[in-house]
């Protein structure tokens, strides 16, 4: 409680210095709370973005290293290799025949 010049006690009177200190502190605290809230929001957004990137990389890795997707392609490639080898051997045999025929003439 504070006494006024008249000597009356009033419990509702607040000293101006107290008001100034309270005002300064509350403004600073409001600013700090706002900054903390802004940081939390940006942190939440960053976490969401990182999760999206992580999931995207995970899917890409699965596609790159999943050998079951390559199975059909590998089988087709093996089949084509066999055909090419067969054609090469046929070509060699035809070339030998052609060379023999040329030598006879």
From Swiss-Prot:
Coiled-coil stretches are 70-105
Q: Which InterPro entries match?
A: Snapin/Pallidin/Snn1 (IPR028119)
Q: Which of UniProt's keywords are assigned here? A: Coiled coil, Endosome, Transport
GO cellular component terms, A-Z: endosome
Tell where it localizes: Endosome
Q: Does the keyword Nucleotidyltransferase apply?
A: no
Q: What is its main location?
A: other
Subunit (UniProt): Component of the biogenesis of lysosome-related organelles complex-1 (BLOC-1).
Query: What is this protein's function per UniProt?
Result: Component of the biogenesis of lysosome-related organelles complex-1 (BLOC-1), a complex involved in endosomal cargo sorting.
Family membership: Belongs to the SNAPIN family.
- Please give the name of this protein: Biogenesis of lysosome-related organelles complex 1 subunit SNN1
Whose protein is this, by species?
Zygosaccharomyces rouxii (strain ATCC 2623 / CBS 732 / NBRC 1130 / NCYC 568 / NRRL Y-229)
Organism lineage reads as: Eukaryota, Fungi, Dikarya, Ascomycota, Saccharomycotina
């Amino acid at each position: 409680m504070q006494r006024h010049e008249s000597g009356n006690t009033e419990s509702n009177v607040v000293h101006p210095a107290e008001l100034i200190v309270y005002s300064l502190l509350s403004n600073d605290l409001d600013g700090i709370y706002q900054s903390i809230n802004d940081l939390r929001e940006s942190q939440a957004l960053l976490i969401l973005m990182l999760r999206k990137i992580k999931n995207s990389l995970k899917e890409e890795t699965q596609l790159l290293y999943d050998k079951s997707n390559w199975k059909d392609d590998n089988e087709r490639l093996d089949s084509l290799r066999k055909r090419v080898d067969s054609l090469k051997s046929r070509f060699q045999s035809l070339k030998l025949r052609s060379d023999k025929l040329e030598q006879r003439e």
